[in-house]
Design a protein with these regions (language model features):
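Intrinsic, low-complexity N-terminal interaction/targeting segments
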Residues: 1-27, 69-127
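The feature marks the first
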Residues: 1-53, 57, 61
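Short, structured motif recognition centered on aromatic/hydrophobic residues
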Residues: 25-31, 51, 55, 107-111, ...
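Short cysteine/histidine-rich zinc-coordinating motifs and their immediately flanking basic loops
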Residues: 162-169, 177-180
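N-terminal pre-domain and mature-chain start segments
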Residues: 38-42, 50, 57-78, 116-117, ...
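Mixed-charge, glycine-accented linear interaction segment located at domain edges/termini
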Residues: 38, 111-166
C-alpha cells in the first residue's frame, strides 16, 4: 500500500473557519506544524458539523469523565484564518477519518482529497493533542451556530421568505400567510 501523501506529524495549529455570509459561506480547516508547513482543507458545512460531532464522540470515549467542549475563549496569537505564506497543501476534503494513536496518546486525523481514491492512502495525515481537538470542536460549534436558522419541523435552513416544509403538509404558518415578521 502507498504511503500518505502529506504526513504533517503533530500539528501546533488547528482551526476551523467560515468565510462569507450565512447561506453563502465556505468552510475550511487550517493546520500547521513545527516545520512551518500549512495545510488548508476546504470542507462542506455538513462535513464540518459531522467532524465536530465525531470529535466529541472520540473524546468522550477516551475520557468518559470529561465530556465538556472547550470554549473557544481567548483567540490564538494569530487571528483565525490568517496565512502568512501560501499553504504547503490545499485541497477539498472528500472523506475524513479520526482515530487514536494509543502509543503516542494523540488523536489522528486523515483526510482524502475529493478527487482522490477514498479507498487509497489518505492525502493528509496528522496527529492532534486532545486539548486541540476539544478546542476545535468548540470552534466548530460556534461556526455552525452562526449560520441561518433552521426550521424546527424539517431542519431545512430558513432564508427569510416563505418556506415549504414537508412535515407541515404544505401549510404556511399564520405569519407566513400574512407576511408578518
Amino acid at each position: 500500500m502507498d504511503e500518505v501523501r502529506y504526513d504533517f506529524a503533530t500539528v501546533n495549529r488547528l482551526e476551523a473557519e467560515a468565510i462569507g455570509r450565512p447561506g453563502q459561506r465556505t468552510f475550511r480547516l487550517i493546520l500547521g506544524n513545527e516545520r512551518g508547513e500549512t495545510a488548508v482543507l476546504w470542507i462542506e458545512k455538513e462535513q464540518v458539523q459531522a467532524l465536530g460531532d465525531a470529535i466529541d464522540r472520540l473524546l468522550a470515549h477516551l475520557n468518559p469523565r470529561r465530556l465538556k467542549r472547550l470554549d473557544v475563549g481567548p483567540r490564538p496569537p494569530e487571528p483565525v484564518g490568517v496565512l502568512l505564506d501560501p499553504p504547503t497543501i490545499e485541497f477539498k476534503i472528500g472523506t475524513l477519518a479520526l482515530g487514536y494513536e494509543a502509543e503516542q496518546r494523540l488523536c489522528l486525523l486523515q483526510a482524502h482529497d475529493i478527487e482522490g481514491d477514498p479507498e487509497g492512502p489518505p492525502t493528509l495525515r496528522c496527529l492532534i493533542r486532545q486539548q486541540q481537538f476539544r478546542r476545535l470542536s468548540g470552534q466548530i460549534a460556534g461556526i455552525v451556530s452562526t449560520g441561518r436558522p433552521r426550521c424546527t419541523m424539517c431542519g431545512q435552513p430558513l432564508s427569510g421568505g416563505p418556506h415549504f416544509c414537508p412535515p407541515s403538509n404544505g401549510h404556511l404558518t399564520r405569519a407566513e400567510r400574512l407576511g408578518d415578521d
